[in-house]
């Protein structure tokens, strides 16, 4: 179950990060700077090749996400739906 939830987080955060960068009109390097990571690591994250760390997720929610509450509510719904389906 943990790997399934991690996959949901990876997919959901990847889409939200792409959308936020577009809304903020930032380059990949600028977005990486806001998330305190190097550009190469950010590119991997943006392409969904890696999952964000707890620190990266927190920085994203604080400095980049246009609506952190909405992000977390939708992520919670996705997690709950997955858990119910597995039960």
Where are these regions (language model features)?
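A short, Lys/Arg-rich alpha-helix, primarily the initiator
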Residues: 1-23
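Short, charged recognition helix plus adjacent turn
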Residues: 5-7, 44, 51, 69-87
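Short acidic alpha-helix initiation/capping motifs at coil-to-helix transition points
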Residues: 11-12, 50-52
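Short basic helix-loop element that most often maps to the first helix and adjoining turn
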Residues: 15-31, 59, 84-85
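Short alpha-helical DNA-recognition segment
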Residues: 25-44
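DNA major-groove recognition helix of helix-turn-helix/homeodomain DNA-binding modules
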Residues: 53-73
């Amino acid at each position: 179950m943990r790997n399934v939830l991690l996959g949901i987080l990876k997919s959901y955060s990847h889409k939200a990060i792409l959308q936020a960068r577009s809304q903020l009109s930032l380059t990949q390097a600028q977005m990486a700077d806001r998330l305190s990571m190097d550009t190469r690591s950010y590119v991997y994250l943006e392409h969904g090749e890696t999952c964000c760390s707890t620190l990266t997720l927190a920085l994203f929610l604080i400095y980049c996400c246009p609506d952190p509450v909405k992000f977390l509510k939708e992520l919670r719904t996705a997690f709950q739906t997955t858990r119910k389906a597995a039960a």
